[in-house]
Amino acid sequence: GVSTILGAKKVYLLAWGENKAAMIKECVEGPISDTIPASYLQTHNNAHVALDLSAAMNLTRIQRPWLVTSCEWNDKLIRSAIVWLCQLTGKPILKLTNKDYNENGLSELLALYGSAYNVNIKIFNDLQHTITGWPGGKPNADDTYRPERAKPYPKRVIIFSPHPDDDVISMGGTLRRLVEQKHEVHVAYETSGNIAVGDEEVVRFMHFINGFNQLFNNSEDQVINEKYAEIRNFLKEKKDGDMDSRDILTIKGLIRRGEARTACTYNNIPLERCHFLDLPFYETGKIQKNPISEADVEIVRNLLREVKPHQIFVAGDLADPHGTHRVCTDAVFAAVDLEKEEGAKWLKDCRIWMYRGAWAEWEIENIEMAV
């Protein structure tokens, strides 16, 4: 138990990843509590906490360093401090005063900029310039203070969607704007998403295709007849925890493809610009996936070579519960790195944007483009 651990001469607590950040903050900085046994390590005189930056991101010294030490101020840190001060005081940026800065550990900014007014104006303008109605850049307009450049126009765009719904869930409005503003938009669905489909959906679609075979082909298609019987029997005998057969996983993947095509059609994206990559790491039939491999990276790389995009959108909500978003984004970055090593010319005119949606939102201070 806890008392045995506390009796050790030295204790190490290890953690990594964004999903541990909130708990680490409670363990290290929160009150000692029975509900968080690791918080008792605060009483140990030789306890060490080893973290990566993602797990440490909520600690005061990382998130709000101005409260514990002098800072080397840069634009990002100043923006973080002002957003925090607004939330703390309940005031909008332009109403912050010298007193607010002095009473909350931000007097260094007054010394740096001369007054609260000067800091307020700077950060207000910085945040205002992230807001745009032109995610692909506004053609024939001054782009000095816009988040995306005006040229080239139109742009070739790839939106990488880890599952066949993340594109519309997380950046559906942005996707629609890009299409409406005449950019060449491609959507790359990185995984099949098959394990998210329920067995009842498979039964429904099998009833449909069997009925189609009966009505239009007098039930003469033996492949459909055999698969219909085989899959119905399999699902009838299937127990909780049993893995799906490869055929059922394929059908579930087809169902997700149909949903994705419908979404693209609704947003006026030609079906030839819908790319189903079916990255191999995902195809285990289980929640636990395989590690990313060279085969995964090569599939992504081939698409990049084909399209030569000016904009790439990848999932930035890396704390999704299954870890698929992080692996998919890593595959894109690995492919880009390989292209960079080979001196790919298209990369010189390409920008990568990370979107968030279903599992996490960007903090105000970290937003670079809000559409």
Task: Give residue ranges: language-model regions.
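Di-metal (Zn2+ and/or Mg2+/Mn2+) metal-binding site signature of metallo-dependent hydrolases
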Residues: 162-180
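Structural beta-sheet core signal
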Residues: 13, 49, 159, 187-189, ...
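Conserved phosphate- and dinucleotide-binding cores of soluble alpha/beta proteins
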Residues: 1-82
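Conserved strand-to-helix beginnings and helix N-cap segments that scaffold or border functional pockets
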Residues: 25, 168-172, 322-329
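Cofactor-binding loop segments of dinucleotide-utilizing enzymes, especially the Rossmann-like FAD-
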Residues: 16, 52-54, 162, 190-192, ...
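Charged, composition-biased interaction segments
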Residues: 36-37, 225-247
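Metal-dependent de-N-acetylase/amidase catalytic core
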Residues: 1, 89-158, 177-180, 190, ...
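Hydrophobic anchor at the start of a short beta-strand
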Residues: 11, 47, 185, 271-272, ...
